[in-house]
Amino acid sequence: MSDLSARLDALNPEQRRRLSAGLRTQRAEQVRAPVALPEHLRRSLYFFASADHADAGSYYAFVLEAAAEADAAGQHAVWFPERHFVDFGGFSPNPALLAAAVATRTRTIRIHAGSVAAPLHHPARIAEEWAVVDNLSGGRVGLSFGSGWHPDDFALARDDYRERREVTGRTIEDVRALWRGETLPYPSTAGTTTEASTRPRPVQEELPVWLTATGTPQTFVTAARAGYGVATALLGQTMPALRENIARYRQEWQDAGHSGKGDVVVMTHAYVSDRPDLEDFLRPAMHAYLRSFRKQTGGSDEFVLLENAYLDFLTGPSLLGSPAKARAVLADLAAAGADEVGCLIDFGLPAADVLESLPTLFDLGVAAVERSA
């Protein structure tokens, strides 16, 4: 154990509280100016829980209830990830399964994958599975595709990890073609070729597609040139970097000659409440969530680093905080160019508390608010 770890472990609760306060004072107060929150900014729910904080059955019941509430409140979409072999996101190894369950419990909300790890699957299976969900939902499916990043995931892959980005591009185009009803040749047994056309036929003629971007500028460029939307997050990129990436995406979209302006979805953590103990209430769940995230990336889980990261979330551009703070962040994201904000709600808080908070999240208005300068 390092000397820093030993010193942190020796802190009593009051000393840890004072440490947190000291870290917080190092963050400059935001300068604010009035701005109107655009009505076009869509809001959705993102699900990306760590599988070490609840039992699976209870978690799935929570997802279905939250999705039903979002549907009733007129929210735009729910998004489900694909993760393998780790706790982080581990409740969703196949987003089509959760999507199918939600499709039968909702009426209007869109149901999206955020994302499908394209290199791990045959394009025909992706098209088939999601066409089922499209039929169950009456045409509410959309897919964001990712290239995968963890080498362990590629135990499931047909192709080499080093070729994952090229494979992703080919897979997306194959899925889109199959979705439209085209027939594609695929290798079969004994050196033969199968002419594949998928069933069932989906409700939507065209599949809405996004490319998942962690913040790497080239991914925004690739998506724009191909005519895809972008699904990104504030985890791993700053607000200035996000603004630059979105501006780059819009310019590349225009230069490629596409109609419209593309589509950008930004995910951020969300729990909106005026409760006076909010910081202390959120801390254990956020520490555990960040620890799970750092575990998969090989990062440190020392208290001071977790606390620093937590306070960055609390005081930065997340929807963790009061309604006034959340409205300000939504305005900032709209000003940065976001078309949709995905609210990640399942980061370890008790399900009852999250569900109780959803009306406040859904009721964030479009009146004049404050925006960080």
Label each PLM-derived region with a short phrase.
Residues M1-P38, A373:
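Flexible, low-complexity inter-domain linkers and amphipathic docking helices that mediate domain-domain
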Residues F47-Y60, V116-A124, E205-G215, S273, ...:
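Active-site mouth loops of central-metabolism enzymes
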